[in-house]
């Protein structure tokens, strides 16, 4: 139901008729309100209808007025709501203002508790050479005036005069007449006039002190001057009271007023003025200034120190020393000569309340500054050498270190490195210019080249390394660069640069020695300087190769010399050889039932045939055999002529014979293949030693008869050569064993020797092939043919494989 009721009401209110009705009602109400407002403003009373009787007029009037006032009540109600809201806002605003005021008061109280931060002019402590009496002494708080009655300025003046401390006798103010005021005014004028005279010593124009006094008189504020003028006027009126009879108003003064202190200040100024005028001479010059050089330093300024008598304080190690800026000539003269120009800024630092106080302080400061500066000037004149040494000391070095630096080593700081860099640059540049001038002389080209090399290296060192070092010094001094550069870094870098500087110095010394020797030894120093070192490992290897090549060349030259003397050696050998050797130069093979004799082919002939087959160049036996014989005959000539021991002579002969064969073999190999020369020559000695050892071991084991040594040697050689050529030989001699029974014993012995020699030849051939370089068997096809030939020479037997015969 609620939903339907509200819905019907909404539809009713939203109808067109209801909207028109509401508009008409509102319009009528507004018209009534306007009419009543105009009526109340113009007439202030209700309208009276004449038709209404008197009795009902009041009621009607009341009713009408009640009806008329009903919209007024509604408007008053609405107006009252607005007023209430505005009143509430006003109350909130007032409350906010009160809270804000309370907050300000609380903050002020808290600030007062914490203390107010005061801002003012900072007055630093006075330096030692200035006056410290009046600046250092603080004004004592004035005590309250102990008087119960009425306090006047005259009474406070009398009290301050009684309690004043000092030896000055100031006449008390008397109440005579107005002449004292007239006397005081001329004194003030005289004081202002006399002030220029105090500082015009030696100057005809107005001094800077007079200008300072005028400037200060202008800067004094009016609030500072008023109490002084008022005090003087009241003093005058007070003094004039007995004569004039007019009562002067005496304002009550507080005990802590500044007026008595100002009066006392004026009196102090009078006393100081009288003392200054008494001290001045007839020309306005101070008497003390004339006797300044003879005066001793004031002892009152000396401060007591707890340090020992000769103790010198030094700053810590890491503390940066104070750097004094250099003085210009004008500032140096102003500092050393006694004048008062430096006092121009004094009024800004120490300002006083009155002109009299400022003038008095300036006078006393001028006197003491003149005294101090004159003393400093005298001390500087007496110790000129000490001051010069101090001013010439290196920048950044403390005074204590500067005085002791003559005996100790100077510290390695930035000025030290700059100084040493400049000195080295100047020295090396002078050397370069000196030696460049000597290039025009008539000297050798090698000496000129050496001079140009040394000078160029020196200039490159100055341009590159010295400039780099200078940049590092700048970085250290001005704190530049990505990383901080310290003096230790500079020291290490200079150590590296000094090695190059020493090298250049050594080269200049070599040039000086070369010049002293008359430019004669110019080749040796240049080679020593310009030659580069060779790596020791490569040197040893190359040396070994060179030694091997030299040994191979020497052996080849010996073989060639032996071949040149071949014809003469052949003739001598044929003439000296006995006929018996021709019979023995046969190999005899006895099989028991038959006997075979064949001519002997020498070992050198066999080897030469093999070499000819190997390289494809056929060699005739007539050409090869004499070469082997020539080498063998050359070695035989070196043997002693006397008959040696059989064993030793046989072993030596076999050794030489085999070595001759090996030498001829090496010669044949070296001639067509020069690439294999080095390796074969290097291993030649090793092969020879192995052959000697094998031959010696075999020969010692052979049972030999005590026959002729030469015959046995030849038989052994023929047996070896015959065994190697038994297969290829075709000259066979067969004999009946029955007819040769007388030689059974000899044949058995020869057979044993032949077997031993065959074994010796096998071992010799195999060992020689094993000792040959492996590269030959891999690279050259001739070596394969060579290895096949000895194998063929070894394949022979002593049985029926060679020749088959039927038994008898």
Swiss-Prot record:
Ranges of compositional bias, category Basic and acidic residues: 135-145, 180-193, 232-241, 249-278, 642-654
Chief location category: nucleus
Matches recorded under InterPro entries: SAPAP
Region (Disordered): 134-282, 377-413, 629-654, 735-757
Cellular component terms per the entry's GO annotation: cytoplasm; nucleus; spindle pole centrosome
UniProt keyword annotation of Aminoacyl-tRNA synthetase present: no
Residue stretches of biased makeup (Polar residues): 382-392
Coiled coil: 88-119
Protein's job: Potential cell cycle regulator that may play a role in carcinogenesis of cancer cells. Mitotic phosphoprotein regulated by the ubiquitin-proteasome pathway. Key regulator of adherens junction integrity and differentiation that may be involved in CDH1-mediated adhesion and signaling in epithelial cells.
The protein, known as: Disks large-associated protein 5
Lineage: Eukaryota, Metazoa, Chordata, Craniata, Vertebrata
Recorded name of the encoding gene: Dlgap5
């Amino acid at each position: 139901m609620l939903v339907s009721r509200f819905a019907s009401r909404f539809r009713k209110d939203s109808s067109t008729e209801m909207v028109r009705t509401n508009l008409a009602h509102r319009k009528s109400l507004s018209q009534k309100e306007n009419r009543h407002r105009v009526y109340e403003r113009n007439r202030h009373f209700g309208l009276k209808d004449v038709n209404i009787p008197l009795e009902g007029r009041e009621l009607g009037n009341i009713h009408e007025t009640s009806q008329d006032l009903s919209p007024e009540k509604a408007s008053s109600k609405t107006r009252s709501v607005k007023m209430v809201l505005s009143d509430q806002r006003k109350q909130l605003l007032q409350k906010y203002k009160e809270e804000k005021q309370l907050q300000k008061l609380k903050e002020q109280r808290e600030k007062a508790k914490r203390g107010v931060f005061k801002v003012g002019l900072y007055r630093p402590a006075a330096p030692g050479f200035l006056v410290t009496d009046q600046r250092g002494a603080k004004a004592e708080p004035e005590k309250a005036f102990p008087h119960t009655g009425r306090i006047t300025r005259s009474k406070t003046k009398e009290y301050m005069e009684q309690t004043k401390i000092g030896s000055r006798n100031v006449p008390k103010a008397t109440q005579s007449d107005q002449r004292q005021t007239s006397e005081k005014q001329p004194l003030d004028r005289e004081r202002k006039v006399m002030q220029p005279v105090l500082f015009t010593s030696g100057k005809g124009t107005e001094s800077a002190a007079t200008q300072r006094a005028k400037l200060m008189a202008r800067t004094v504020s009016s609030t500072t001057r008023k109490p002084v003028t008022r005090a003087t006027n009241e003093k005058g009126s007070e003094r004039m009271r007995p004569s004039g009879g007019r009562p002067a108003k005496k304002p009550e003064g507080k005990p802590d007023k500044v007026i008595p202190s100002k009066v006392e200040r004026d009196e102090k100024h009078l006393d100081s003025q009288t003392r200054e005028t008494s001290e001045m001479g007839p020309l306005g010059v101070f008497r003390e200034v004339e006797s300044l050089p003879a005066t001793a330093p004031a002892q009152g300024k000396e401060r007591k120190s707890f340090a020992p008598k000769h103790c010198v304080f030094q700053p810590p190690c890491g503390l940066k020393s104070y750097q004094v800026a250099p003085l210009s000539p004008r500032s140096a003269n102003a500092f050393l000569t006694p004048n008062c120009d430096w006092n121009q800024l004094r009024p800004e630092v120490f300002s006083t309340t009155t002109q009299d106080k400022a003038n008095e302080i300036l006078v006393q400061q001028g006197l003491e500054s003149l005294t101090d500066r004159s003393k400093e000037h005298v001390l500087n004149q007496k110790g000129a050498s000490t001051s010069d040494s101090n001013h010439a000391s290196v920048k950044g070095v403390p005074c204590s270190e500067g005085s002791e630096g003559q005996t100790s080593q100077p510290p390695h700081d930035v000025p030290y490195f700059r100084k040493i860099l400049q000195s080295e640059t100047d020295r090396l540049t002078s050397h370069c210019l000196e030696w460049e001038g000597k290039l025009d002389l008539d000297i050798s080209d090698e000496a000129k080249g050496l001079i140009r090399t040394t000078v160029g290296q020196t200039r490159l060192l100055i341009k590159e390394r010295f400039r780099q070092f200078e940049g590092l010094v700048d970085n250290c001094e001005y704190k530049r660069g990505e990383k901080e550069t310290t003096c230790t870094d500079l020291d290490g870098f200079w150590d590296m640069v000094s090695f190059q500087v020493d090298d250049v110095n050594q080269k200049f010394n070599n040039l000086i020695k070369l010049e002293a020797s008359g430019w004669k030894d110019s080749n040796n120093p240049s080679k020593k300087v310009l030659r580069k070192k060779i790596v020791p490992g490569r040197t040893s290897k190359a040396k070994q190769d060179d030694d091997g090549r030299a040994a191979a060349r020497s052996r080849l030259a010996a073989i060639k010399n032996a071949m040149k003397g071949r014809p003469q050696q052949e003739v001598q050998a044929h003439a000296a050889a006995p006929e018996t050797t021709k019979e023995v130069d046969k190999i005899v093979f006895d099989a028991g039932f038959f006997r075979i004799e064949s001519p002997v082919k020498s070992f050198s002939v066999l080897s030469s045939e093999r070499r000819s087959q190997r390289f494809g160049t056929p060699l005739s036996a007539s050409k090869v055999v004499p070469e082997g014989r020539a080498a063998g005959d050359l070695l035989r000539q070196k043997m002693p002529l006397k008959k040696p021991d059989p064993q030793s002579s046989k072993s030596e002969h076999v050794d030489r014979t085999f070595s001759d064969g090996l030498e001829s073999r090496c010669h044949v190999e070296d001639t067509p293949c020069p690439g294999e020369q080095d390796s074969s020559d290097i291993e030649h000695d090793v092969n020879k030693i192995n052959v000697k050892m094998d031959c010696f071991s075999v020969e010692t084991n052979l049972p030999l008869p005590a026959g002729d040594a030469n015959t046995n040697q030849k038989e052994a050689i023929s047996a070896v050569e015959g065994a190697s050529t038994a297969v290829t030989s075709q000259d066979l001699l067969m004999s009946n064993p029955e007819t040769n029974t007388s030689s059974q014993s000899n044949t058995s012995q020869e057979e044993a020797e032949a077997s031993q020699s065959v074994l010796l030849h096998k071992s010799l051939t195999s060992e020689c092939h094993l000792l040959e370089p492996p590269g030959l068997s891999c690279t050259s096809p001739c070596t394969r043919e060579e290895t096949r030939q000895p194998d063929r020479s070894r394949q022979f037997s002593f049985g029926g494989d060679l020749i088959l015969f039927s038994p008898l």
